[in-house]
């Protein structure tokens, strides 16, 4: 396009938009005029400022000229740049025309030479065929020797000359690969691929090579598998096997690298490659380890032989480990880390084997053997905790032999088995105890002089022994075992209490059958005290480890012990009452009034019982003596009140009061001689008899209200019925006095003080009936 055309086009475009251009000019001019007007109005705001109009005009003219010159300079440089660019475009167009002309000529020459390429392709095929034939001719001597080399290599394998056999095998494989490559053509060429028939022919001809590989591998893995057994005798075959494995591993890496490279991308991998004999080496070692361990007393792992089996495993592992560390480790490269691999194989086998053993129906001793071996022996310095092994491998990375869930299941199984055994032994011990109660001799006496039987010793030793054995495993298992033992003891004590009750029933049916009934009741109380001490000791062992998950302590055994002791003490008091009853019936008789032998006989019974109570351990000994005193006083007062006698004169009142006072003094003296404190809480039971005697012997009936108020202050549980019986016994109380006394009791009902044990609450007063007089000579 010419410059004139361009100028014409530009002019045409300018003619198309004259309005838009002039609008902008007009707008700019208006803005300029407005700015000038604003500026002038600010400068010439006063007439005297017009004098400087010439100066301002000259300055603005100079500024306008400067701006115009700068604009011209910028436009000129822009035009020069445009002119230079146009020149470069013209030169480039000329060069492109030359290149297009050369390409056209080259295309013409290529079309002329296309017929000659076909001739060259034929020549190339002839050349490839010639090379293959030349290779075949050069390989004929090798091909003739293949069969003889195969036979010779087989003999070497059979005689376990493994290194020589492997060298011959490598040579045969190299010949086979070279023949295949030569038949395929030069490397990197794009010629024809190997014919499948030719490849099959070569494979068949070298078929003996594959058999040699299998035979060599069989012998090789046999040597590796027997390495642990033959290491001390002759490690040479094992060393040869490792060297062959490393050679094969190097060949595998070579072929893999060759196929990864660009030049060997199209070359097929030799048959049977990669062999990965190093991985197979460790696999064979693992199988050999498993086979050796399975042969260690495997047939005798059930029953009592399980502990021996685990011990044999320990000795086998440590013996083989010593062989690996001191013999086989020097026969392999350092990067094999054979000791670490052996530990890993052992750990995997033990995980599987112990998982199988844990699934069996094991007895308590067998479970203990497994837990002790897993938690303590395996990680101890006798096995994997040896410092040299810890430096070689961190056992924690292998994981536990038995999972945490599996351990908990085993521990629960152990506790259940021990529970069954404990329950059976406790039942047998209870049966022996019941048999001992029927013996015609008193119970055994310990070195402290207390009655006892074999029951607490058996129970205590059994529970403590189970806790001690469980602690050898873990504190948690010890706590579980203790809790189980305490629960079983609670069941035993419930049966024990039932047996004591039945023992008492049989004695009440025929008291003459068992002469030592009381003695064995006292022995039962001592047994419970011993069991309580043992129970508290076991509970303290649990309390000393509050953080464990089994921190809940069963309180049932102590409550069961308390119930059993209370029942035995109640039966002891029933037996005392049974022996006192004939003497209590003689109270308020003429013999009692005249001679007083009844009270002496009662004291004799109390002495015999208290002597036996000395065979009881504290605090039950003191409790029995206090109950003995309490029972005697209560029964004495009950006998006085239930017979409802009436004194017909002051002499009779005096006689009755004197006898009661003498009885109270005799009881007090005998009780003190038997080291029984007369005070229970703040009340002296024997003082009650003397207090009742004082009320009966009171001369002035008008003073009864004062005496009754004093009696009420000491014995606040006395009722109107009891006081009414006392007034009836006097026989001389006016109705007004009786009414005032009973009204006073009705209005004064003091609360029972803390620690006060009611007496009159246990004494039931019979309904009113015809009273009888004192047994005087006239009445008789």
Swiss-Prot record:
Single GO term (MF): SNARE binding
One BP annotation, GO: exocyst localization
Chief localization: cytoplasm
Pfam name, any one: Sec6
Subcellular location: Cytoplasmic vesicle, Secretory vesicle
Assigned keywords, A-Z: Cytoplasmic vesicle, Exocytosis
Gene Ontology cellular-component annotations: exocyst; transport vesicle
InterPro entries for the chain: EXOC3/Sec6 (IPR010326), EXOC3/Sec6_C (IPR042532)
Main function: As part of the exocyst, may play a role in regulated exocytosis.
PANTHER family listed in its UniProt record: EXOCYST COMPLEX COMPONENT 3-LIKE PROTEIN, EXOCYST COMPLEX COMPONENT SEC6-RELATED
Family label: Belongs to the SEC6 family.
Name used for this protein in its record: Exocyst complex component 3-like protein
Taxonomic source organism: Danio rerio
């Amino acid at each position: 396009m010419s410059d004139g055309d361009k100028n014409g086009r530009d002019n045409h475009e300018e003619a198309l938009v004259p309005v838009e251009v002039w609008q902008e000019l007009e707008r700019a001019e208006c803005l300029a005029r407005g700015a000038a007007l604003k500026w002038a109005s600010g400068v010439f705001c006063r007439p005297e400022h017009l004098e400087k109009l010439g100066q301002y005009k000259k300055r603005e003219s100079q500024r306008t000229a400067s701006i115009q010159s700068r604009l011209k300079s910028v436009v000129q440089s822009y035009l020069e740049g445009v002119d230079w660019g146009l020149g470069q475009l013209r030169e480039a167009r000329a060069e492109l025309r030359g290149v297009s002309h050369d390409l056209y000529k080259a295309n013409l020459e290529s079309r002329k030479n296309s017929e000659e390429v076909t001739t060259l392709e034929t020549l190339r095929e002839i050349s490839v065929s010639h090379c293959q034939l030349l290779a075949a001719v050069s390989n004929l001597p090798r091909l003739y020797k293949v069969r003889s080399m195969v036979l010779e290599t087989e003999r070497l394998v059979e005689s376990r000359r493994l290194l020589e056999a492997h060298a011959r095998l490598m040579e045969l494989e190299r010949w086979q690969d070279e023949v295949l490559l030569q038949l395929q053509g030069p490397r990197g060429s794009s010629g024809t691929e190997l014919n499948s028939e030719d490849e099959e022919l070569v494979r068949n001809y070298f078929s003996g090579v594959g058999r040699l590989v299998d035979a060599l591998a069989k012998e090789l893995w046999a040597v590796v598998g027997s390495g642990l057994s033959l290491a001390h005798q002759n490690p040479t075959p094992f060393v040869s096997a490792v060297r062959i494995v490393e050679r094969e591993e190097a060949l595998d890496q070579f072929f893999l690298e060759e196929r990864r490279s660009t030049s060997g991308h199209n070359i097929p991998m030799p048959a049977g490659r990669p062999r990965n004999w190093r991985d197979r080496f460790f696999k064979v070692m693992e199988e050999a380890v498993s086979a050796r361990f399975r042969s260690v007393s495997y047939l005798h792992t059930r029953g009592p032989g399980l502990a021996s089996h685990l011990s044999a495993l320990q000795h086998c592992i440590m013996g083989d480990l010593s062989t690996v560390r001191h013999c086989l480790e020097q026969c392999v490269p350092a990067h094999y880390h054979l000791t670490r691999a052996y530990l890993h194989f052992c750990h995997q086998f033990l995980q599987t084997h112990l998982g199988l053993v844990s699934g069996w129906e094991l007895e308590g001793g067998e479970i203990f053997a497994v837990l002790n071996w897993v938690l303590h022996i395996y990680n101890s310095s006798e096995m994997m905790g040896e410092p040299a092994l810890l430096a070689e491998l961190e056992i924690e990375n292998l994981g536990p032999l038995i999972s945490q869930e599996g351990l908990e299941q085993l521990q629960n199984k152990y506790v259940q088995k021990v529970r069954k055994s404990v329950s059976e032994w406790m039942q047998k011990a209870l049966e022996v105890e019941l048999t001992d109660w029927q013996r015609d001799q008193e119970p055994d006496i310990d070195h402290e002089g207390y009655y006892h039987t074999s029951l607490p010793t058996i129970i205590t030793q059994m529970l403590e022994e189970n806790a001690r054995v469980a602690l050898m495993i873990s504190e948690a298992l010890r706590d579980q075992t203790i809790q189980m033992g305490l629960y079983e003891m609670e069941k035993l004590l419930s049966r024990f209490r039932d047996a004591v009750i039945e023992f008492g029933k049989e004695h009440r049916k025929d008291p003459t059958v068992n002469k030592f009934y009381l003695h064995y009741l006292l022995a039962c109380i001592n047994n419970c005290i011993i069991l309580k001490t043992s129970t508290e000791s076991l509970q303290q062992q649990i309390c000393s480890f509050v953080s464990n998950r089994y921190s809940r302590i069963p309180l049932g055994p102590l409550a069961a012990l308390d119930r059993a002791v209370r029942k035995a003490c109640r039966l002891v008091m029933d037996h005392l009452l049974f022996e006192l009853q004939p003497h209590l019936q003689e109270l308020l008789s003429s013999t009692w009034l005249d001679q007083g032998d009844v009270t002496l006989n009662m004291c004799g019974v109390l002495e015999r019982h208290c002597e036996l109570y000395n065979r009881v351990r504290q605090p039950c000994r003191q409790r029995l003596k206090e109950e003995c005193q309490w029972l005697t006083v209560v029964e004495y007062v009950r006998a006085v009140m239930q017979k409802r006698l009436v004194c017909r004169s002051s002499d009779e009142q005096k006689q009755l009061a004197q006898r009661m006072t003498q009885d109270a003094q005799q009881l007090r003296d005998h009780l003190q001689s038997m080291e029984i404190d007369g005070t229970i809480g703040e009340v002296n039971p024997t003082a009650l008899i003397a207090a009742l005697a004082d009320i009966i012997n009171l001369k002035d009936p008008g003073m009864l209200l004062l005496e009754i108020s004093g009696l009420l202050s000491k014995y606040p549980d006395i009722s109107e019925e009891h006081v009414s019986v006392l007034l009836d016994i006097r026989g001389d109380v006016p109705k007004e006095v009786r009414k005032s006394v009973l009204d006073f009791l009705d209005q004064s009902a003091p609360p029972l003080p803390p620690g006060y044990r009611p007496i009159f609450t246990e004494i039931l007063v019979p309904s009113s009936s015809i009273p009888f007089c004192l047994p005087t000579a006239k009445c008789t």
